[in-house]
C-alpha cells in the first residue's frame, strides 16, 4: 500500500526511511544486501537473497549438465560451419549478464534447438580479438531479442562464445 507495508513498521521514522530506500520494490537491482537491522527485517530483501541463492545453485547444475555438450556438434541452416561448445564457452554463457538471466542460462541446455531456429545475421571482426571473426545469430529470450555470438578462430575452430541482450553488439 501507500506505506509499503512489506517493510517493517517499527515507528514513523523507520517507515519514512523505507520510502527513501534505494532497494524498495520497483527500484531494485540488489548486488549487496544492506547491512543494517531494518533492511535485514525487510521481507523484500530476504526474498531477493533467497532467489539469488536459488539462481546460484541452478547455475551450477546447468554448468554440470552442459558439460555433455562439449562432445556434440551443432549447426545452423544459414551458417555452413560446425559449431562446437567448450568449457570456456559454457562458463562465458553462464557468466554473461542478461535482463532474463535465469531463462538465458536454461537456454544453454537447449542450444541445439536454439541454434537451429536462430537467424544468422552475418559476421565481423571480434572487438576483443582482431584475429577472430564473430558470427551473430538472433534469437529470443523471454519475448526479447538476444544475440548468440559464435567465434571463428584463425586455426579454423568455430566455437559458441556467449549471448547478449544488448543491441550494441550489432554496431
Describe the residue ranges of each PLM region.
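Ribonuclease/tRNase effector modules and their secretory precursors
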Residues: 2-27, 34-37, 41-171
Amino acid at each position: 500500500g501507500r506505506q509499503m507495508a512489506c517493510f517493517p513498521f517499527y515507528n514513523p521514522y523507520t517507515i519514512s526511511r523505507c520510502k527513501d530506500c534505494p532497494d524498495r520494490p520497483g527500484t531494485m537491482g540488489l548486488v549487496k544486501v544492506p547491512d543494517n537491522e531494518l533492511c535485514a527485517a525487510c521481507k523484500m530483501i530476504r526474498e531477493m537473497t533467497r532467489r539469488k541463492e536459488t539462481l546460484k545453485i541452478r547455475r551450477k547444475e546447468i554448468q554440470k549438465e552442459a558439460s555433455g555438450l562439449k562432445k556434440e556438434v551443432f549447426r545452423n541452416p544459414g551458417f555452413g560451419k560446425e559449431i562446437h561448445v567448450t568449457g570456456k564457452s559454457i562458463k562465458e554463457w553462464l557468466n554473461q549478464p542478461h535482463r532474463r538471466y535465469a531463462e538465458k542460462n536454461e537456454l544453454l541446455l537447449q542450444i541445439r534447438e536454439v541454434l537451429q531456429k536462430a537467424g544468422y545475421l552475418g559476421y565481423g571482426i571480434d572487438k576483443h580479438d582482431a584475429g577472430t571473426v564473430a558470427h551473430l545469430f538472433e534469437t529470443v529470450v523471454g519475448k526479447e531479442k538476444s544475440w548468440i555470438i559464435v567465434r571463428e578462430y584463425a586455426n579454423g575452430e568455430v566455437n559458441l562464445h556467449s549471448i547478449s541482450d544488448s543491441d550494441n553488439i550489432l554496431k
